[in-house]
Regions:
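Conserved Class I S-adenosyl-L-methionine
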Residues: 157-179
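Short beta-alpha junction loops
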Residues: 81-82, 147-151
Length: 225
């Protein structure tokens, strides 16, 4: 008898550990979420500081990993609207426009910049501008996501849910757009159905040393699978 699997993920049955994917214990399917890509790219990388952009009420992505496993010395969380309460005191809250971050933190001020669920809420021109800013802020790595499609029925569906006017969808992103500007993406995993199909995950090693050490090279580019 065949049918759609009611997935049971191994991470729900085992103690927490840094993972680069989760596997269904029933059908063997593999899925990778934002945290999995963070771990994949930074597990062997010394990281002392992280900037999370678009933090909102959910808090920084991979918070437990950064604080308790990587033991970062300083974290920054940036959001123009709201930031989760009761965060670990290691996180400094920056309630501000992310396009002004260079004025506050300065170039090469953090090891890693991450921005998930953020780019799609900027106009495309501002999205590219943010990517340039993030590259200036980071010493080692920038990793972001961008919505490929709307995650709801209308561009303002999130605004109607939580009242945050900045949650309007203003742009959509494709893997090729990142490849054209020299970034790597999750295309290989996306094509296999392992990534969330509504987003592209993209990253750039500002320090090329870590690109070589990660082993993630041209295989993550369209046409090089």
């Amino acid at each position: 008898m065949t049918g759609r699997c009611d997935h049971v993920w191994d991470r729900s049955l085992e103690p927490w550990r840094p993972r680069t994917f989760m596997r269904c214990v029933k059908c063997g399917a593999i899925r990778r979420d934002f945290e999995h890509y963070v771990v994949m790219l930074t597990l062997d990388m010394p990281v002392e500081s992280v900037l999370d952009v678009g933090t909102g009420n959910k808090g920084p992505v991979a918070e437990h990993y950064w604080v308790h496993y990587k033991r970062i010395k300083r974290g920054y969380v940036c959001d123009i609207w709201t930031i989760k309460e009761n965060l670990n005191p290691i996180w400094v809250k920056l309630k501000m426009n992310a396009l002004d971050l260079l004025d506050v933190l300065g170039p090469r001020s953090v090891d890693v910049v991450q921005a998930f669920g953020f780019l799609e809420h900027l106009e495309k021109e501002d999205g590219y501008r943010f990517l340039e800013i993030a590259e200036e802020l980071a010493r080692k790595l920038v990793i972001v996501s961008g919505a490929i499609t709307l995650h709801g029925p209308t561009p303002d569906y999130k605004v109607k849910i939580d009242g945050n006017p900045y949650h309007l969808y203003r742009s959509l992103w494709r893997h090729e757009e990142f490849h054209r500007i020299g970034w790597q993406t999750d295309w290989e995993y996306y094509a296999r159905g392992e990534s969330y199909m509504g987003d592209v995950i993209a990253w750039k090693f500002v320090d090329p040393t870590w690109r070589r050490k990660s082993g993630l090279g041209q295989a993550t580019r369209v046409g090089h699978l």
